[in-house]
Amino acid sequence: MALLQIAEPGQSSAPHQHKLAAGIDLGTTNSLVASVRSGTASTLVDSQGRSILPSVVNYGADATRVGYPAREQAETDPHNTVISVKRLLGRSLQDINQRYPHLPYRFKASEKGLPIVQTAQGDKNPIQISADILKALAERATATLGGELAGVVITVPAYFDDAQRVATKDAAALAGLHVLRLLNEPTAAAIAYGLDSGQEGVIAVYDLGGGTFDISILRLSRGVFEVLATGGDSALGGDDFDHLIADHLQAQIGLTSLTAEQQRALINAATQAKIDLTEHMTAELNVLGWQGTFTREELENLIAPLLKKTLLSCRRALKDAGVEADEVLEVVMVGGSTRTPFVREQVGEFFGRTPLTSINPDEVVAIGAAIQADILAGNKPDAEMLLLDVIPLSLGIETMGGLVEKIIPRNTTIPVARAQEFTTFKDGQTAMSVHVVQGEREMVDDCRSLARFSLKGIPPMAAGAAHIRVTYQVDADGLLSVTALEKSTGVQAEIQVKPSYGLSDDEVTQMLKDSMAYAKEDMLARALAEQRVEADRVIEGLVSALQADGDELLSEQERQTLLQAIERLIELRNGDNADAIEQGIKDTDKASQDFASRRMDKSIRSALAGHSVDEI
């Protein structure tokens, strides 16, 4: 039977056309898709009523399988079955081999050193594999909602760097999806929780998924979601629990080496044991011909060191946010790994309150993303919710002496644009090198280099006369672009920062630890470098002045006095005493004051020559 569209005469049958939008939680272990229907956000299920899609792709010789069918192939066809591909996104093959030496895949490197998985269907890179997962989720959404998606919001860990975010967007484009926004996973959870409860105040979002851990401290007030601070580990999650259990079982069985099939069988047994121990005190195991029990106490002993790492990140995030644990009103639990009773107990003890688990921890991120997608698609024009994310590490620029000038401090809300003016160091300088760095330390050598580019075409001027405006802009997805503009000519250079691969697992945490551990040494090193730069400026300026006017304006004795002052300052500059260099600069300035006055008089006389008093 044909359906008739009925509307008032002269009025569209859909005066306020609802655009189809979805939120996608592209997870390490599992992925989900959700959408707002009839004003309520909910996850979309497959034909068997399952909301979760395992983040697994099998490239068999006969077909490509995604989700549950792919996971079934993991044990029998490990080389062609890719699990936890999210851990490979935006990383180099060298980094992957160092961090995950036991992966069963056959890797080779691309020309840029990025990983390629060799499968029965040919070479596949992490972006292509992720795209296949996104396609499966998009097909589910299209079938459920009855039309093509106008756009999606995809969630990423808060600690994903530029390369990992770009790779996620590239995967979405390959899947034919229009990305409305990338959204930090803890922030998505805050959206879902905040709208459901109407709570106001400081909230901690503890997100322990399959492959990543994030802690976010947020303030919810009158519809405004502000991330006060973030922390975490981009490679710590439930997968690590599984591997610890598998290693324990391997020792129990007495196996010294494993085939890929045996390794996968152990991982599967470990995962099932972890799930069983969520409800029971013991788990019965039958794997590789070995039968035995695994207790909740054994599990807790194994995972305690990893949980301690997450709580250290929580303590650091609270310090960054400037709040105490007792100021946190609620703790939101996100990620399937938070179902483990020991995790909930430890987090509850740390914050001094029972964590909230009323929203399904597997679904909360996708639901929050769906709510945000609905707003960005224009379906809620009156929505008052304002979302503010932050950058996890400071972004800066190298200045003379190897110093770092921070342009955007860490935990600044994004999107954001900040600019500073810089100038030339040498007379006649016509180009400037811009070195973009990331980190909390005072010296360039202690920070992470992101990119370099040059601004050419600066008009030749005296040192310090040119004005170069350097602008750092971070968009809503956390991607950075840097622009350098010479103000008098309009000459401009720009670069988008897209590193070839991301930070190693412990680099972010280590960078923050180092910034605190070496704070005093860094400030002393910075003070020394600053005095050396100033000494170089004074020396170069005075040498240039002597070459230009020394013979004309100074006696030989005066000239020798200044040369001795320069030599003394050079000697001090090459030393390690910042205070001595500072005093040497003052002494040199004092010794050259009379010479500077004579040069000024000469310049004035030259400017007035040939002009009458009336003209002046």
Curated annotation (Swiss-Prot):
One of its GO terms (molecular function) is unfolded protein binding. PROSITE patterns: HSP70_1, HSP70_2. Gene3D superfamilies: 1.20.1270.10, 3.30.420.40, Actin, Chain A, domain 4, Substrate Binding Domain Of DNAk, Chain A, domain 1. One of its GO terms (biological process) is iron-sulfur cluster assembly. SUPFAM superfamilies: Actin-like ATPase domain, Heat shock protein 70kD (HSP70), C-terminal subdomain, Heat shock protein 70kD (HSP70), peptide-binding domain. Keywords: ATP-binding, Chaperone, Nucleotide-binding. HAMAP family: HscA. Chaperone involved in the maturation of iron-sulfur cluster-containing proteins. Has a low intrinsic ATPase activity which is markedly stimulated by HscB. Belongs to the heat shock protein 70 family. This is Chaperone protein HscA homolog. It comes from Vibrio cholerae serotype O1 (strain M66-2). The gene is hscA.
